[in-house]
Amino acid sequence: MKRHIVALAFSFLFATSALSAQTFEEYMVMMDSLSMEPPQIQTDFHRKYKVKNLDYGMTIGIERTPGGRIWNCFVAGGDNEDAYFVLNWSDDNGKTWTDSKYVIDPHDKSLPFARRTIVGQLWTDPLGRLWLFYDQSVTYYYGSSTNWYSICENPDDENPVWSEPKFLGIGCTLNKPTVMSTGEWVLPVSIWDRNTMAYTVLKDVWTDEEFRASKAELDPVRGAHVYVSMDQGKSWTDRGMTRFPHPTFDEHIIIELGDGRWWMTGRVGIGTRNSGIIQSFSSDKGYTWSEPEIYQPHISSRHFITRLASGNLVMVRHGRFDECTKTRTNLTAFISDDDGKTWKGGLLLDDTYDISYPTGFQAPDGYIYVSYDLQRTRRGEIYLVKMTEEDILAGKIVSPEGFLKHLIYKPGKVEKSKANIAYRKANKKNKVK
């Protein structure tokens, strides 16, 4: 009820006066209030959320539960202010997938601005509970976003139940927490830089000066944060942070090294300009961090690193570990047995153009599952890889159940999307020229 009262109040406000008549301070109050309304996980939703009716696809997170179910979370709507989350699952090790099971769509036509959910992750904790982290912001990004989580205690049941969303703090979480040898749970949280703000959406209602001043109070803390829980997720504390040069969404991952240090890797740059996988180290459990430095050349895009049961690390990235591909292609997996100093093997997962955002997990039987998306606007497909360390070291699938390029999601109306139509028109125009 409170949510509807707020929505009606904003609707009335904007129905009685133009957007341009509102003050900068009033915009901030409205946007902050809209971002703080808890985004609900919906189980009873309109048929437009069925896979056959979706028109976009971007992978977010994938995770296995104690009973063997694999959950998938992806973005529908677009990589913009139209974004929302859809979840489904597989009960046969990723071979077949259900239709949409849950939706997080905070959009409301009665609101003066679009409100989206676009960043998050799935994670099974040591207690067997499935977590869903997800953010919320107004427009694409107005300089701030709120970070939330819900927990499912029965993720393998026919009708899993999610807890009410709980506010975590300002920012967003794209990659999984890490459980340290000390028992600490360590969660990466990013407060995006100002260069991601939706000026194209807000330029008609804010002056340049106001835009530059928006959410200025967050400027000193924009960057890659480390949240820590000492009580198995009951509470979280922002322990420390670092700021990357040329930041682009941060997208950081935190690994505990054999010598006890914490190793953070992240994303920087735009395209191939100032880009790479960046790294920073903490010797005091995340309170302070070394000056960030480039770890490996890499196109500006998400990478994936996690610790395996063997003690080795697996990394999935674009191209060889010593190259920066010109486009998002050649997703390749490597193994390190010396905490990331060197990498071995090299299993090419996919050499298609415009593939991105690998994320994954290791199952108890040793198989490593990684999902990624393909041409989000034009095809919107999500693929799954199942492999072992031996496959990666051999450079080919040698395990009996391993596979590459297995399609797990294809939106039914991607060709009719606004973005796809615009792309085809632009492509046709360029060919004419």
Language-model-detected regions and their locations in the chain:
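Bacterial N-terminal signal peptides that target proteins for export
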Residues: 1-7
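Asp-box/BNR beta-propeller blade signature and adjacent active/binding-site loops
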Residues: 22-433
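Bacterial N-terminal signal peptides
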Residues: 7-17
